Swiss-Prot record:
Signal peptide: none annotated. The lineage of its organism: Bacteria, Pseudomonadati, Chlorobiota, Chlorobiia, Chlorobiales. InterPro entries: Ribosomal_bL27, Ribosomal_bL27_CS. It comes from the Bacteria. This is Large ribosomal subunit protein bL27. Keywords: Ribonucleoprotein, Ribosomal protein. It comes from Chlorobium chlorochromatii (strain CaD3). Belongs to the bacterial ribosomal protein bL27 family. Residues 1-21 are annotated as: Disordered.
Length: 85
């Protein structure tokens, strides 16, 4: 028989903080240079033309333009920024 009843509950009750990952600027939306387009863990989606990648794999716009998602080489997803104006 157990002599300590409350031990199990102390091993539970913790939760990690939200990381707010995902697409921040949808395809077809207008972005300014430096705008974050996508936050991700690892390069699930690769940067294309006029899109840069940060050290935490964040993809951002290098120029003002319109966001475009497409399938690139080897069926890998890719995000580009098409310059406008």
């Amino acid at each position: 028989m157990a002599h300590k009843k409350g031990g199990g509950s102390t091993k539970n009750g913790r939760d990690s903080n939200p990381k707010y990952l995902g697409v921040k600027a949808a395809g077809g939306s207008t972005v300014a240079a430096g705008t974050i387009i996508l936050r991700q863990r690892g390069t699930v989606i690769k940067p294309g033309v006029n899109a840069g990648i940060g050290r935490d794999h964040t993809i951002f716009a290098l120029v003002d333009g319109i966001v475009s998602f497409r399938n690139g080489r080897n069926n890998k997803k890719q995000v580009s920024v098409e310059p406008c104006c």
